Amino acid sequence: MSSPLIYPGATVCEGVTFGAGCVVGTHVYVGKRCQLGESVRIQHGAFLCNDMVIGDRVFIGPLVVCTDDRWPKVNNPQYHAEPPMLEDDCNIGGGAILLPGVRIGHHATVGAGAVVTNDVAPYTVVVGCPAREMEREVV
C-alpha cells in the first residue's frame, strides 16, 4: 500500500487508514478511525467526522462537511455518533453538507452546496437544500 499524499495544513487523526493513491488537500480534517479506500481525493478545507467509511475512487470537493451528531452532545448522555458512509465511485460537490447517518450510494453525485438529509441511491444525482433527486430529461 502506498502512502497518501497529504498537503500542508491537513489534520489526519489517529487510527485513520488509507488505500493506495489517496490525496488529502490543504486544511482538510480527517477524524479518528476513518477508513478511506483507494484513490480517494479530498479537496481543500473538507471536514470528515470520526469513523467514516469511504469507498474507492471517491471525490470529496472543497469545504464539504460531514457531520455525525443529530443532537449536540453537550449535556446529552444519550449521544450516539452516526457518521455518513460514502460508497465506491461517488462524487460530493464543493460545499455540500452530509448529515448524520446518510449513505451515499455507489456512482451517486451530490451537487455543490447540497444539504443531504436522507440516503442517496446508487447512480442518483441530488441537488439543493434539502437535497432532492434531479429529474432526468428524456432526449
What are these regions (language model features)?
Residues 6-8, 114:
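Residue-level marker for the onset of beta-strands and adjacent loop->beta junctions
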Residues 122-124, 132:
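Glycine-centered loop/turn positions within well-structured domains
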Residues 110, 128:
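Conserved G/P- and acidic residue-centered "switch" motifs that form tight phosphate/ATP-binding loops
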Residues 63, 112-113:
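Alpha-helical segments that scaffold the active site and NAD(P)H-binding pocket
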Residues 106-109, 115-117, 122:
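Internal alpha/beta core interface subdomains
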Residues 2:
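A glycine-/small-residue-rich N-terminal strand-loop-strand element
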Residues 8, 13-104, 129-131, 135-138:
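Flexible, glycine/small-residue-enriched loop-and-beta-strand segment within the central core
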